[in-house]
Regions:
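Flexible, processing/modification-adjacent segments and terminal tails
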Residues: 27-38, 43, 98-156, 160-161, ...
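Short, solvent-exposed secondary-structure boundary motifs
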Residues: 54-60, 75-87, 130-141, 155-160
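An acidic-aromatic
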Residues: 65-129, 177-188
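Gly/Pro-enriched, hydrophobic low-complexity segments
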Residues: 78-92, 148-209
């Protein structure tokens, strides 16, 4: 009788060890994928020349952000189209050398703010570098599901965690599509193509000036 119990416990222990080994292999695989994406993304962390577009949809509201950046100078715009609001709303942020202009508008009403950093810069490049530290990487590897998928003919890793889905381009570590709860966003990037003439000073002739 004792021998039978011992054999049963050995079988259970072997099954548990096999399951633990499979789980460990899955976590290690995901950890390696995340690490590779972080390493790929490092090439883009300090890029100072890029053009980016971000389009997001949430509760029927559409936001379109565009950004031209070159060596510390930039022209950023955000436009918002609400399902219940026919007026276009948005903001413009311009910086070239020592000159800064911010424009906030809603319909025909426009306010220009000159040479004051009162509008936050628009962050449009989403780089998979948040998980640069070991512990966040390990947590994501343990809790997420990672598969391969195509997003707009781009080969990606699809990372899923609860209501959060993120498509990360395999070759760059750039996030090109994201679903977070009720918000869906898509991103497009081009690097090292922005010229000085792309950063056009906005016309403020029809704006109310706030200095």
């Amino acid at each position: 009788m004792e021998n039978k119990k011992m054999k049963l416990w050995k079988k259970i222990l072997i099954i548990v060890l096999i399951l633990c080994a499979i789980l460990a292999i899955c976590i290690v695989r995901k950890f390696i994928i995340i690490t590779n994406l972080v390493n790929e993304a490092k090439e883009y962390v300090n890029k100072t020349n890029y053009y980016a577009i971000v389009q997001s949809l949430q509760n029927g509201n559409v936001n379109m952000a565009k950004s031209y950046n070159k060596d510390g100078n930039y022209l950023n715009t955000i436009k918002n189209y609400g399902k219940d609001n026919q007026d276009e709303r948005g903001l413009v942020k311009y910086k070239k050398d020592n000159e800064e202009i911010g424009i906030i508008y809603s319909g025909q009403e426009k306010i220009a703010i000159l040479n004051e950093t009162v509008l936050a810069n628009i962050s449009v490049v989403n780089i998979f570098s948040t998980f640069d530290n070991f512990l966040p990487r390990l947590q994501l590897a343990a809790m997420s599901r990672i598969t391969t998928d195509n997003c707009g003919n781009i080969e990606c890793y699809l990372i899923e965690l609860d209501n959060w889905k993120m498509w990360v381009e395999k070759d760059t570590g750039l996030v090109i599509r994201e679903i977070n709860g009720g918000m869906v966003s898509e991103r497009f990037y081009e690097f090292d193509i922005v010229k000085d003439e792309d950063i056009i000073k906005p016309d403020i002739s029809d704006c109310k000036i706030q200095e």
